[in-house]
Structures are given as C-alpha cells and as structure tokens.
C-alpha cells in the first residue's frame, strides 16, 4: 500500500456560473498544487460539491482529475453520499476509473446510529475493493462516529484511515 502521508488537499470543483464544470480551471488548480508540493488530492469530496453535483458530473470530474494527476500525486476519490447505495455506486465507479483510495463521509441528514454506520461502511467495502478512508465531520452531518465505532471498522482491512474534522 502507498504511503498516505503528507499534505492532501480537498479540492474545490471549479464551475461556471451556470453550474457546468470548468475543466480548464480544474487542470490549472491541480497543476498549481503539484508545483506547490501537495502530496495528494481529494477529488469531489465535500469541499468539491459532492452533495450538489449529479452522478455524471461526479464521474467526469473524478476521471478528469485522475487524468490530470497522471501519477504525479496521490489521488483520493470522494465517494461519500447520504444514500448507502449511492456511496457504494460511487466507490465502484471510482475503482473502475482507476482510483485506489476513496474518502467516504458519514451519511448526512438521516443521522444513522453507530450500528447503522458500521452497516453502511461494511456494505460498501463488501461490494468494492477500493480502500476506504472514513470521514467524520459531525458539524456538517449531524452524525458523530464514536471511537468504538471507528475501532470496530478498523478491523476491516479495506478501511485504512479516517479524516476527522
């Protein structure tokens, strides 16, 4: 497994006023981060508008980001969603495109129990091979993953880390 240490940036998804993705700005932004010494990019995470763009745009931005990075930095796909099925589908799509790592925020709005969180992540990892990084951001999701839940999930070899915000 690749070393996931260093500076990782949760990249914004640049858009035009009409909501279309600005791929020229995406390339410029990624190139700037590469030349500035950034070690890894998280594409279409919560900072990248994952909750507001459609599945096709999500796919296209993930794919284009990986093409632009072209092995120069570590690429992490934002695959979190409120729906477990959608998070699974995004994880499978990221894996198909060529990502090795995904960042998956806890489901928001529905406020799952700790048991529900375990079931959510176990379901996703049971359906895909991509390595998952848990993302706990209770101030945004109204759901706080407890240390005991993280401990239980850490027993899963496909869950390789956590982003705590």
Report each predicted region and the residues it spans.
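Acidic-histidine catalytic/liganding microenvironments
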Residues: 72, 156-157
């Amino acid at each position: 497994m690749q070393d996931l240490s260093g500076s990782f940036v949760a990249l914004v998804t640049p858009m035009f006023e009409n909501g279309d993705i600005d791929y020229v700005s995406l390339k410029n932004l990624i190139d700037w981060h590469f030349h500035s010494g950034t070690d890894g990019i998280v594409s279409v995470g919560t900072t990248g508008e994952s909750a507001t763009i459609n599945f096709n745009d999500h796919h296209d931005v993930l794919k284009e980001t990986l093409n632009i990075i072209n092995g120069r930095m570590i690429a992490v796909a934002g695959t979190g969603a409120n729906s477990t099925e959608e998070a699974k589908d995004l994880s499978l799509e990221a894996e198909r495109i060529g990502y090795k790592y995904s960042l998956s925020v806890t489901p928001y709005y529905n406020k799952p129990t700790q048991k529900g969180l375990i079931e959510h992540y176990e379901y996703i990892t049971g359906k895909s091979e991509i390595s998952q990084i848990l993302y706990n951001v209770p101030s945004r999701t109204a759901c706080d993953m407890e240390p005991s839940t993280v401990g239980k999930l850490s027993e899963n070899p496909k869950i390789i880390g956590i982003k705590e915000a």
